[in-house]
Amino acid sequence: MKSFSSCILNSKIEIRCSDRTGIATDNLDELFAYLVSKQEGFNICWDVDVFVAPILKVLSIQQVEDLFNSGRISIGKHTIIYNQGKSLRISLSYKNAASFYWIKQYYQEDEEPSLDDIKVKGEIIITELAKIGINPKKLTSSVAIFENIFDQLNLPTYKDIPVELCKWTWGQKGRAWTEAFKLGHFDMCTDLDINSCFPSIMADLYDTRYGTIVHSKEIPEAADYVFARGMLDTSDYFTPFVYANEYGHLFSPRGKREAILSKQGLDYLKEYDAGTFELQDAFSWVPTRKFKPMHYTVNKIFNQRSGNFSRPVKRIFKGALNGIYGRFYQEFRDGTLGKQVNPIWGFLIEDGARLKIAEYIKNNHLEKDILAINTDGILLEGDYNIESSTKMGEWRIDNKGPALIVSSGTVFFADKKPCQVYYHEAMDMIRCYPEAVEWHKKAERLITIGDALQGWSEELGSLHETSPGFSLIFDHDRYYPSLPQTGGELLNRIFPSQPIDASSLVTAK
């Protein structure tokens, strides 16, 4: 393993390597030849966007734009493949190439170390993974580290699913449940979360190749998976059935709207008397065998998180479990799909998470105390005590304390950092300017390739002062009879809501 750093020195690009070699040149062919020569073992840097910045600075604006748009450009005999925030690959040919990965993603709390210490940190990861038989081919991300293992599972993909069903479920992607029910400041809140929510659902998914998928006007009794299209009508204070308007904005409304429901969703409506559904047609999977191809692997990775591993390796386990879900909806820049795309699995995971939350609220009569829902957790008003579990898919208390809720996407609580602002910072901002409706703080961020195209090419790879912040909004995803007009009002009053009416929304898609 070798670690690298880069900079501009006397108008030349200087690359330093932990093997005590290096180069300083203004000739790109020489530079790339040096980098391509570093093929043996892993090549790592602290931050790949910082590492690549000196190279980007000497490219033409057209070359930078081409690289930004396609992720790939050719310069002389060499090809550059740059996956922003992930990896850099320099090649002369497919086999004659060198890749560079960043490890800051696994050491998020650490300051940038020395070149030698970067190498040590990388070796810690590789050594610990090797002890449990994991020998990654690349370090692009947590999921990439486990790619060989996931590839060996031979999972069902979109190619095994009727095209029309793929269209139905692909259209439902990105509907995680994020909703604020009350706005204001709350002195004591309890945050309940599901341990590894998405992975717990993923572990129990069936391989639909073992059975038949039928399209009909009725649902077969023997069906285990159902994707029912029809007219949904709900009137509850909350609903797990998320709706997207023509602009892709998400709502959980009451009233009638078109929807696609799973079998679990249909059962939820019936068990909790939560609404009605007029069936138009459905795709149903009738199994001949109930096989869970991810069950063993997901449970094994989850259990390894509690082992005697360093913090970065535990972060890799967690990232791999959560990240594999994204592969089921993976689409590349050129429109091609990832090899593990499976939109019915993606749909069942998101849908299952929403229904787990809704069922927990119903079973524990928590409706009146819901403050916010955020994908796999519930923020409740008050000091709640439950028996926290460490098992995958079960509930735990994540944290307790005060919260400030500005909107569905802006909930300041504990160590959460919406808009790059912590709870205590948000409170200080509003207390200093209680009559304001917008607040900002000073911060720094890295100037990236996208910024270069906006005239910031000279600052590429450097830190630039910015002003992240938040503001009161007056267009919410729920109906608020009254809204705070100033920060002071937000701190001193509670603003309850009701579900927005589906009839007021634009046609769903």
Per-region residue spans from a language model:
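Conserved acidic
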Residues: 24-509
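Gly/Thr-rich phosphate-binding beta-strand-loop-beta motif of the actin/hexokinase/Hsp70
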Residues: 1-22, 196-199
